[in-house]
Amino acid sequence: MLRTHLAGELRKEMAGETVTLTGWVARRRDHGGVIFIDLRDRSGVAQVVFRESEVAERAHDLRSEYCVKVTGVVEPRPEGSANANLASGEIEVNVSDLEVLNKSAALPFQIDDPSSSGEVGEETRLKYRYLDLRRERQHEALRLRSAANRAAREVLDSHDFTEIETPTLTRSTPEGARDFLVPARLKPGSWYALPQSPQLFKQLLMVAGMERYYQIARCYRDEDFRADRQPEFTQLDVEMSFVDQDDVIALAEEIVSALWKLIGYEIKTPIPRMTYADAMKYYGSDKPDLRFDIKIVECTEFFKDTTFRVFQNEYVGAVVMEGGASQPRRQFDAWQEWAKQRGAKGLAYITIAEDGTLGGPVAKNITDAEREGIAEHVGAKPGDAIFFAAGDVKSSRALLGAARGEIAKKLDLIKDGDWAFTWVVDAPLFEPAADATASGDVALGHSKWTAVHHAFTSPKPEYLDSFDENPGEALAYAYDIVCNGNEIGGGSIRIHDQDVQKRVFDVMGIGEEEAQEKFGFLLDAFQFGAPPHGGIAFGWDRIVSLLGGFDSIRDVIAFPKSGGGVDPLTDAPGTIPAEQRKETGVDFKPEKAAKAAQGEKAGKES
């Protein structure tokens, strides 16, 4: 090794020892001919000082991010000059020898200056990601990710799971998003697909008798670009044979508990569960944030005889903002704009004065009986504001769900270090295909119904006989785990019976021929004693970003894509030259090849 110690591990007890350090020049200061340098390596920073004239003279030429090797003696810092912000802050290294291992060009941005981190655009940070990663916060992210990998593996290994890699070049099998396709050079006109998940292969592993499988898997989805999505992402993928929902949930809770212990938080288990129906009814989301106690109150029945046309609708609901009546008029106007940005016409409201008098435009348009009873119905008191949404059930609840989150922010109800976990169970097995496409997903199949999770999710046992007769009523044997309003994992008990799988395909408008073409290898496997099985997949990027308190999943990925799906570092995706296009067969036209083959055959016959 070129060094004897790490910079961040030096302590005052080591005073008098001669050490050799390697790393980068984080800061350089010249105090009357004595040169001080903050030397950074993966462990942290140590102050090194150049007092001897010859070596100090050479140190004058050092600049930020020069890669250097120094040898010197560990000494206590002079009284009053200790730095409590550094683990090595009580010592310095008096350097006797300096070697410049490599110089650095002028930096595109300052690395160790905290004030510059917010000034550097993300595109620039990602273009020079190798410099951005030198920052301590980014080091923390990748070390935390490694620790999370290790913690999960320890739990799974203790339960006799086997880590197995599944293919990343496979055939295109629709799973709810578009595939990334890879041309097969040796078979022109044919394409591999990068997997959206290991779903089908892990089910085949259960048929193979592996019983307990896991993998930290790379997945790929060609989705429309969203602010906090990545075209390639990582999930912890788990599958088990001979289990029911409670078994998978118990294991998942053990994994999640181990992960949050990394940051010193003890999760109380069992984690509470709520049904999908209750999540939507009370929180307007299947990913409810339970760090604050604001619930949606249904008012449809309360306003069933109303003369107010806005409330003469399929659904009316409300949320209460404690103390919200004191907001100025411009703030209520801002609420209207906020709602319009979400596709609503506005956000109706009532204010309750300290004397109980109702104010706001809604109060003028409802009946005396409605005015007298509304506060009690929604649980509001003097000084509060009541916000309403009316219209179709889905969009109205979604608006109120967003409003409860906005209220929590305005009232500062969410504190640092708050964690709230829940399982959401009993989701619908199917949804209207139009709803799936409207939300940006790919609706698998050709009927008016498509799978909410995926086509291999089993109906709950009580719906096994009837799900194809009443698809809209059937519930899935599925479970999602939610943390602070983020879905961090989801899974289900799978279909293991070929006949049940065929019936699910029938509901989705996938005929026998198409099913065999796209999923035949799985359906064939089900003929050979497939065991009952189920599993779960955790969104690894999301979990690590939550654990570390990062704003974006891009912060916990070593080399992420930008929000537009572009890699500023390598400038991917890029074009390819004509020669490479020809070689890979990207432009292969089957009909043209067939015509040429026919002509060649005719020529030989003549």
Curated annotation (Swiss-Prot):
Native source organism of the sequence: Corynebacterium aurimucosum (strain ATCC 700975 / DSM 44827 / CIP 107346 / CN-1)
Region feature Disordered, mapped onto this chain: 564-606
Residues noted as binding L-aspartate in the record, renumbered to the chain: E175, R221, H453, R494
Record family assignment: Belongs to the class-II aminoacyl-tRNA synthetase family. Type 1 subfamily.
Gene3D superfamilies hit by this protein: Bira Bifunctional Protein, Domain 2, GAD-like domain, Nucleic acid-binding proteins
Keywords attached to this entry: Aminoacyl-tRNA synthetase, ATP-binding, Cytoplasm, Ligase, Nucleotide-binding, Protein biosynthesis
Swiss-Prot/TrEMBL site (Important for tRNA non-discrimination) positions: H31, G80
Pfam family membership, one: tRNA-synt_2
Oligomeric and partner information: Homodimer.
InterPro entries attached to this UniProt entry: Aa-tRNA-synt_II, aa-tRNA-synth_II, aa-tRNA-synth_II/BPL/LPL, Asp-tRNA-ligase_1, Asp-tRNA-ligase_1_N, Asp/Asn-tRNA-synth_IIb, AspRS_core, GAD-like_sf
Annotated function: Aspartyl-tRNA synthetase with relaxed tRNA specificity since it is able to aspartylate not only its cognate tRNA(Asp) but also tRNA(Asn). Reaction proceeds in two steps: L-aspartate is first activated by ATP to form Asp-AMP and then transferred to the acceptor end of tRNA(Asp/Asn).
Name of protein: Aspartate--tRNA(Asp/Asn) ligase
Gene: aspS
Region of interest: Aspartate: 199-202
Main location: cytoplasm
List of residues binding ATP: R221, D222, E223, Q230, E487, G539, W540, D541, R542
GO biological process, one term: aspartyl-tRNA aminoacylation
Compositionally biased tracts (Basic and acidic residues): 579-594
EC number: 6.1.1.23
Protein location: Cytoplasm
The reaction(s) this protein catalyses: tRNA(Asx) + L-aspartate + ATP = L-aspartyl-tRNA(Asx) + AMP + diphosphate
Signal peptide: none
GO cellular component, one term: cytoplasm
PROSITE patterns: AA_TRNA_LIGASE_II
